[in-house]
Amino acid sequence: MIQPQNVKQVLSRHLLTEGFDIILDLDRSQGSWFVDERTGERYLDFFSMYASMAVGYNHPRLLQVRDRLGQLAVNKPSNSDVYTTAMAEFVDTFERIAMPPEMPHVFFIEGGALAVENALKTAFDWKVRKNLAAQPGNDSGSQVIHFRQAFHGRSGYTLSLTNTFDPRKTRFFPKFDWPRIINPKLTFPLDTDNLVQVRILENEALGSINQVLEERGEDIAALIIEPIQGEGGDNHFRAEFLQALRQLCDRHDILLIFDEVQTGVGLTGKFWAFEHFDVQPDLLAFGKKTQVCGMMASRRIDEICCHVFQERSRINSTFGGNLIDMVRCTHILRIIEEEQLVENARVQGALLLAELQKLAAEFPHLVTNPRGRGLMCAFDAPDSHTRDQLVKAFFQQKLLLVGCGSRSIRFRPHLIVTAGEIEQAMDIICDVMHKGDYVHLEITKDPCLGIGT
């Protein structure tokens, strides 16, 4: 039996272990509280495993089905071709709680990057078939419009889309030269000057997209965007901009893909972030909180025959998603519904944002651009070094937060977070900023920054 004190030593024999310098106690961690198995110390977790844990640690309802989950671990079926009642119960629950009525098609796979990857393949297939039907021999349709500071994964196609602050994610890997557009992100508070500036950027972005469509037209299969960019810096967009993208996609017969791997399943105070903007995507990639990943498609896919949801083996994988993840997701979705956790995210998110705005007023030299929808909140530090020092200081005071973009700190509480826990987090942050000791912290390969996904 490996002891908690030896975990990193054992792992580091073969793996990089530059993540958090704590060992997760899978039994004693509870709700929003991460327990270090080495010391028994509790950390208030406001990163939630990169926004992948919806209902916290050891939710009582999940503990009730622990034996069932263990039973499922004995055999791992190939869900793509071998079916079970457990999978059927999952799909039935997913349809009822998570699937927008306008999106009847769904595909499951393991990993958010592969969710995006298969959304792209769906778009390529759709566009090429459309071009072939209009002009035999015209098999163009192999490019994707995307945005600066986007994070869509680290797999084959997605490497050509991802371009966040950390170049190590994509450097030296072969990539396609697909059109990359400026991201007209909002700066808060959204006063007159900031609104004028973002409209200028929106016009520049839309102009660039129009130019790409004029030059490459038939070869553009899709446009992809995160409704709120996460890893790239918690970058928000105006509804009017996303609506303009929808109109462009309709006008030029390309598919609009929303990557909701991070924004989905209640984090923003709506089940899906796109619901805030009165914009309906053609394809939607999901993951993280759903445990099993995948993508959904609207009826626009049905404009062609033999699309990827009709023709066998066009998109597939051995496992078609992990059955244990599916069953866990079944119960998580029911918990979210019955405990009204999307509404909790909206209410507590409003409190969290208000507290961040107070921080900006009290510490204007440290906190700017406080922003958020629901619990997906962030603020900017003066520079990346100060950001890293603050994150390390918060960690030392038992608060787990991670960075994003070049100098932002992101908040990703569990959907079950309480007002009291938000107040505790703010007390820690205020104490660190008041004392100012963070300026003496050395930042090298810091194990607590967690700028990973």
Where are these regions (language model features)?
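Conserved N-terminal phosphate-binding loop of PLP-dependent enzymes in the Aspartate aminotransferase
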Residues: 1-453
